[in-house]
Design a protein with these regions (language model features):
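Recognizes extended acidic, P/S/T-rich segments that occur
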Residues: 441-488
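C-terminal tail/sorting-segment detector
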Residues: 580-583, 589, 598-624
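Beta-strand-rich modules
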Residues: 485-505
Length: 624
């Protein structure tokens, strides 16, 4: 039976009705540990029906703020530059620019053109009342110049949106998935592939159309491509889907996922087992008209099982992971309305491995709300911004400063970078930093460029020298220790990777590696003669070397490949399993470090490459 989406879900219907009947107090329960956050004084506009995003737009070392939504009788979109504390108040200066004013909005920072700085995408309605006028605009920061509106970007106009970024087609640049509603009240899911020049190739007919919901992107099944989670209202009812990426096409995996709308989803490895778990919260029809629900799903080998953790659900708000207490694992913020006629709440749940999630701090609740963690004051811990409507007023913007006394150290950099190249594909892998055995409490952030230190192929949205990131959240490679790139052009590429802990603090980048793509070796009748006829390993280059050397080798047929390094005494000091590789020319790099990540001393080392039943070896000289 068709679902009457237009009748009950447009903002002048259910949304405004909800806004009238939310009358209970924003908070009432006691906390279970000393209060962690204090509200910071500021002069930012109070916002509801909008979004808040942290990002170092001007690359000066602190997080700026992008706000959009309803501000009193006004509609507002502004970028505020972080100027630090000014007496008793934190100062933000509004950036004069071409931003269009929207509500029922979503916005985000992303480096869409690979130039190393942050661009801005803003979607929403330019009109407060129905029929809504949907609008989507993309803005680019010109180097040393003003903010520029990019016309012809190719992303559809939508409102009541949510968005997520990631390299869906593995070509290096960042693509977009967006859910929302068009001006014609059609729920729509957009998959927009980045053309690399500020324009996108958008598809609206490949996935179920979703509105009034949320989307998240991540490698759920560990196969080195990005999958997605969709949740919200479709023309056929509420739904939540997990979609696996199979070579660019997406298929739903089985599971009894909750059918919710006005929903929020987030991916994160809360149990530290090396895969992405899922939290889903949103509204479902009940005796209370519309009631919030929440479920955490454990990822077990790419399949999802509901966890035993229990907490009140929310709708028209946000659930988000972040390590606010600096113990290494992911905690959870649950922020929104518990029911259509019910309390607005904002709870921080502390992740205690033995005791599950413990309600730790209670903040000012809200609805039509957004929230984001970020270290806006630069003291090394996660602060928090929330927006929405509360019982204290129709609009609010609260910034909470985290006053935890224990500040974590920056994570260590990854080591043992290896690039495996075949045809026009490259698999880049690394080893976790020293001291991260056991629970996996880091994600990884990769950069790839055509010049040393560059990021024009894969943008890390971070400073290549210090490693300081321009955005908050997990790294672009998530919890995996490898990424794959395809359709690479001939040439030499330079790459590195950094660790990102669950408080979103990043290490320096690892010692830079490089690899070379030398044209296609695809097998067909006319091209078979270009494939190697025998297994061969060539001398490393450079030799002697100080920081990194490359060993090239040929495979006449597909084989499982291993790379090992031995000292003069025959002790294995480094090993890497490169997986099954196709026939063709390949290379592997070594940075002079042990498996544990420590630098080895100067001297002569033996290397060996094994491929199936074949092996070959050589010597290399490391000079420190």
């Amino acid at each position: 039976m068709a679902f009457a989406l237009k009748a009950i879900l447009r903002p002048v219907g259910l949304i405004l009705a909800l806004g009238v009947v939310f009358t209970t107090q924003a908070f009432a329960q006691p906390v279970t540990q000393p209060f962690t956050f204090n509200i910071s004084s500021h002069d930012l506009p109070a916002i509801h029906h909008g979004s808040a995003n942290w990002g170092d737009f001007d690359a000066d070392g602190d997080l700026d703020l992008l706000l959009s939504g309803s501000h009193g009788e006004e509609i507002s979109t502004n970028l505020f530059l972080n100027r630090g504390h000014n007496g008793e108040q934190h100062r933000f200066d509004a950036l004069t620019g071409p931003f269009h004013q929207v509500l029922y909005s979503a916005s985000s920072f992303a480096d869409v053109d690979g130039d190393g700085d942050l661009d801005v995408l803003v979607t929403g309605s330019t009109s407060r009342d129905w029929p809504y006028t949907a609008s989507t605009r993309l803005y680019r920061l010109q180097s040393g110049g003003p903010v520029e509106y990019l016309e012809g970007h190719g992303i559809p106009d939508m409102h009541s949106t949510a968005m997520a970024w990631g390299d869906l087609d593995q070509d290096g640049d960042i693509d977009l998935v967006m859910v929302g509603v068009t001006s014609d009240d059609v729920p729509t899911t957009v998959v927009a592939y980045n053309n690399g020049n500020g324009t996108f190739d958008s598809h609206t007919d490949v996935l179920t159309g979703i509105g009034y919901g949320d989307v998240a992107i991540g490698d759920i099944d560990g196969d080195l491509d990005l999958d997605m989670v969709l949740s919200g209202a479709s023309d056929n009812g509420f739904l939540t889907q997990i979609l696996r990426n199979d070579g660019g096409s997406f298929s739903a995996i089985s599971g009894s996922f909750p059918p919710v709308a006005f929903s929020s989803v987030d991916l994160g490895d809360y149990d530290g087992d090396g895969d992405l778990d899922l939290v889903v919260s949103g509204g479902e029809v009940s005796e209370l008209i519309f009631e919030g629900s929440l479920q955490i799903w454990d990822n077990i080998g790419g399949s999802f099982t509901p966890s035993s953790h229990s907490m009140n659900g929310i709708l028209a708000g946000d659930v988000t992971w972040g390590d606010y207490d600096h113990d290494g694992d992911l905690d959870l913020l649950v922020y929104g309305a518990e029911a259509a006629i019910g309390r607005r709440s904002a709870r921080l749940f502390r992740n205690d491995a033995d005791d599950g999630f413990v309600a730790a701090s209670l903040l000012v609740g809200g609805v039509f709300a957004d929230a984001e963690f970020g270290d806006f004051d630069g003291d090394g811990d996660l602060d928090l911004i929330t927006t929405g409507s509360s019982s204290l007023g129709p609009s609010m913007t609260n910034i909470y400063e985290n006053y935890r006394q224990v500040i974590p150290e920056l994570p260590g950099a990854p080591s043992a970078l290896v690039a495996s190249v075949s045809d026009r594909e490259a698999t880049l892998s690394w080893q976790a930093p020293v001291g991260t055995d056991g629970l996996i409490l880091t994600t990884y952030n990769v950069r790839v460029g055509t010049q040393p230190g560059g990021s024009d192929i894969v943008s890390a949205m971070a400073d290549p020298q210090s490693g300081r990131r321009f955005i908050t959240g997990p790294g672009n490679a998530s919890v995996g220790e490898a990424v794959m790139l395809s359709d690479l052009q001939d040439g030499t590429y330079y790459w590195s990777v950094q660790s990102v802990n669950n408080a979103f603090l990043a290490s320096e980048f690892a010692v830079e590696g490089s690899f070379t793509v030398k044209g296609s070796l695809s097998v067909d009748i006319d091209a078979e003669d270009t494939l190697p006829r025998r297994f061969a390993v060539y001398g490393n280059y450079p030799n002697p070397f100080t920081s990194q050397t490359t060993v090239r080798y040929d495979l006449p047929e597909a084989a499982s490949v291993q790379f090992r390094v031995y000292s003069l005494l025959g002790q294995e000091v480094h090993s890497a399993t490169l997986g099954t590789q196709p026939p063709g020319e390949h290379q592997v790099q070594w940075d002079g470090r042990s498996n544990g990540g420590s630098q080895l001393g100067s001297g002569i080392y033996f290397y060996e490459i094994r491929a199936g039943g074949s092996s070959a070896s050589g010597t290399m000289t490391l000079v420190r």
